[in-house]
Amino acid sequence: IDLFNNNSKRISVSGVQIKYSLVADDGILRLTKEGEQGEFILKPVPNNLRNKEFCPANEHLTMQIAAQVYGIPTAPNGLWFFQDGTPAYFVRRFDLSEKGKLQKEDFASLAGLTRKNGGSDYKYDNLAYEEFARIIDKYSSVPQVDKLRFFELILFNFVYSNGDAHLKNFSLLEEKKGRFRLSPAYDLLNTHLH
């Protein structure tokens, strides 16, 4: 765990929680090297939450319930335990293919919101769900299907108390030849516990 903490500035990916970029090397996950594209994101136990030791299991369980019980497409994920038994959550990046990185745009970007024009809490901007639907109508190659998937995801977030369902936790993902679809769900967890 010290290796991760000592390298957090070099390999951390965006977001509030500390995250690390990993790659599979002969079947073993390791930190990415400078300039190397990571295949996985690892999220260790956060420092700033109530019941923080349960956060990795909470996210993994919530993602599994979404996928296995409700049929919501989710990013492949799992739990990883350090040698001292400390858990971490990891997720396979879904914006990579054999041909390289796929374009992924979160809803904050698609709505034109940034820290500069929306302030420090821009991703929590109170856009109505109707505005999310307009974004899907404008950019999705199959808007009716994606709006239904989005509605199901909103209901899931409500039922499972995911209070972190902000603009940057919904994305459209490039498929083929510039066609975009609602991405698999990610960052699903019961925030009421934390």
Q: What role is predicted for each listed range?
A:
Residues D2-S120:
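Conserved ATP-binding subdomain of kinase catalytic cores across diverse folds
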